[in-house]
């Protein structure tokens, strides 16, 4: 972004409420009354909410999120039959909704049609929102009117979730893709059809979950317990750095899988991966609650460990202290993972080199489908 555009962005006051709160107010004050007035016979059939791509759908948006693709918006989800009857006109009416709003000192959002005569202390009118980027337009639009099947297909490639008996299809779906299809909030769903479809994507078959846990155990062992220390001994900082990346990704994913995505959600894409991991770790019911903080320590030390050299750091101690600390954390994480696998009766082995835990976990996979087993 150029200096000029950055200055312009900073000159606009940030909206003090989250995107989800703004979306719910927009639906309640503007969208729902419009549907009741113009489409009364369909009011009991249209689902509304905010799900999909965008920081606000994960609940992690902040002032920095508001310089693009931010503003009052929600989604309306229709059956194929209802979309054929009213979809195009409903989209026109949705786009015509007034989007100017104010936010008072208590955080209450008021849209223009509901503005009070006494506006003292209110947040200044925020207009229609920030500029919309090309990635959120056309076929990639993130709000408005959708067929239910089209909406999920645009995110996952599937109109409905793969069958519970189709593990190969589940394994082709990235966790971040499933996170985008199941995040956000549903404000209204009179028929329950949208929520049922969404729930299908939340309901990862347990055999698939166990297969993914096994895969993550393999990568944690390969990248963190094997290749990382060897790369550091060789002095290959680039290889060590990439090993840390693979180790962190696999370990973070394993934490979400162990906690069961149906309960805690899927791990989102890299930008919000650690925001979600911190939120999960802060839950009183979280499993492996300390792993996220341990991973952040590994990442903080990685520069010194991978590129510190012999004379780096306080007193010229070099990279050795950082390397030792990282290796200790990797092994402690492995110990904690084995304890959790034992607690869940997924293993009877105390072996902490996690590659050797994979057969024990895979013994609990009920299906004989070879895609679920390691080679």
Language-model segments: which ranges?
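Conserved nucleotidyltransferase catalytic core and NTase-mimicking acidic/glycine-rich helix/loop elements
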Residues: 170-374
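Conserved NTP/Mg2+-binding pocket subregion across the NTase superfamily
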Residues: 84-233
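Hydrophobic, Leu/Ile/Phe/Ala-enriched alpha-helical segments that form helix-helix packing faces
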Residues: 27-39, 90-98, 337, 341
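Catalytic or ion-translocation cores adjacent to nucleophile or general acid/base/metal-coordination motifs
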Residues: 23, 27, 44-47, 54, ...
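Active-site nucleotide-donor binding segment shared across nucleotidyl transfer reactions
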Residues: 34-81
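Intrinsically disordered, low-complexity Ser/Thr/Pro/Gly-rich regulatory segments
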Residues: 2-7, 12, 60, 76, ...
